[in-house]
């Protein structure tokens, strides 16, 4: 067994180590060999002293090494955590406080920012390690956390992406401890929400909204004596949370009403009803946002409306999606009304006021603003469905109707404007993802699928490549000549402008191709539609062509087929809808190298052969036993069975039987065929004696009837049509030569197959 490197050796190397050597020391500190109480007071104590010395150094590099060493040794060595974790946390906090002071006075360089990140991460890890450990939490964490929280709040003004995740965790897990700092933190978050919110990246925006929502977990309201009329009312634990959520919902109504200055709401009674159902602003409430001002002469001021709605929608999404320590009530009906109202703000169904229609620039801005407002409603719907699932399906008709308002159409037409759809590609991907979640849980309950068919057309169009220079080639020759005539210096070469020759020579290079992420989202939507709805032939053909062509293209270019395309091909094969032609051969040819189990089973079905063999053997043995025991009884039972079950005239019945002696065959075209002893046939009618399971064919007429009997002569009824047919009985004599195989004693009881006796009542009737 290999012995670990002594801790004292690692401690001596720690201060002077650089690069790979330092990483190697951290690797060895993870070893469980050092979790030994004997080493705690000797070598491990020396190591901790070395780490403390690094943290107290003025060198940024030494502080950085000390942070990583403290995190590793406390994470993998519980003895060090219990004995020295509190001291290490105290030293790290002191260095963090100094760095925060430096950051507030002036900006840090790249190395200083890296050290600041290491200090913040070290404090976060050490606090998580001490949490839920009674002794450490009581003696070190709780006393120290009251000093750590204000320092982190101060730093959150400058480094929100770094600090807000830690503060969010502290609010959630130490709500009571965080209460004194609630007001200070709310001021900073309000500043982020009202000023410069759009300058933050999407992840940081979500952190700001989550922290603002978590502030409502802290009970800041003082106890008020209730009167006799309200003293019996039940108080809910989420009362403060509900107040914060309703305050955000109430901010939407004034913004929707402000859009009434642009659109003529009197033309849409449904929207007027929706606005009436929205949460109103409370009389005593104060908004954290300033009032908006719009100037129709400055169209850019209209963008303040979607900007404010974007902030409110993200705040509301945090209120309904973040986990809480207690149960909260979500007003789904109010959320549905708000989302429907946002998606109803469109100039396609509600006309713009007459005095604003002449300004082309203003109208273009209005349409763009309304699209952004609608997208806020789509994101709210997506969060609702993702969080609450089937509970939201009671609003399914409202959701689909509201989403259908987002589809752009050409002017004065019901045709989809695919160019605008491509410009709204990011927004439509959210729509496809939302509809996929709904359809997967609704199944075949939808009756009106016109909206889904429109989405299929849009999705297929988004998968096509777009040429960036398409408009260049659409200019007419007349326009070119007109432009040339206005040019003064026709023959003078413009050296300041580059050549446009590549546009004509290499036009295929100026294209926008669909990325794999878009394909994945669309394929999931197509799979949910195909699996849960029966589409018409036109849509199924388009989807099959798209899946086969794109999958084959990826296979040729990348050497493999993406997973979502394999799932789409599988769904098209298993769920063909009303189609009778399968794409299985083409799908198997495309993904034959992927070793897909489903296609392998469909291409090579495996039957339970052992079970089939045992059934065949059992049937044969039972037939011989019955024949040996009581052949006459067996024949009578068979005859009665077939008499009770007439054979249809239009079918061919083949019956195996065994001939021990020459038999007579009476062919009755009306009802039955009887076999009698003592009648033989000539050799020209029957060739030779044949083994069992073969057939003899006797031609009686052009219409053939095949029958098979087993073991004994029996009477077999032949089905007769509803018409009454009168015809005399004809006899056919059959001679069976049993002497041709005298040397084979074991074949005396062999089965013979008699050719089908062809009976034709139609021919006799014609005569």
From Swiss-Prot:
Keywords: Nucleus, Ribosome biogenesis, rRNA processing. GO terms for cellular component: cytosol; nucleoplasm; rixosome complex. It is found in: Nucleus. One of its GO terms (molecular function) is chromatin binding. The keyword rRNA processing applies. The keyword Amino-acid biosynthesis does not apply. It holds the Pfam family RIX1. Residues 699-767 are annotated as: Disordered. Component of the RIX1 complex required for processing of ITS2 sequences from 35S pre-rRNA and the nucleoplasmic transit of the pre-60S ribosomal subunits. Regulates pre-60S association of the critical remodeling factor MDN1. Belongs to the RIX1/PELP1 family. This is Pre-rRNA-processing protein RIX1. It comes from Candida glabrata (strain ATCC 2001 / BCRC 20586 / JCM 3761 / NBRC 0622 / NRRL Y-65 / CBS 138) (Yeast).
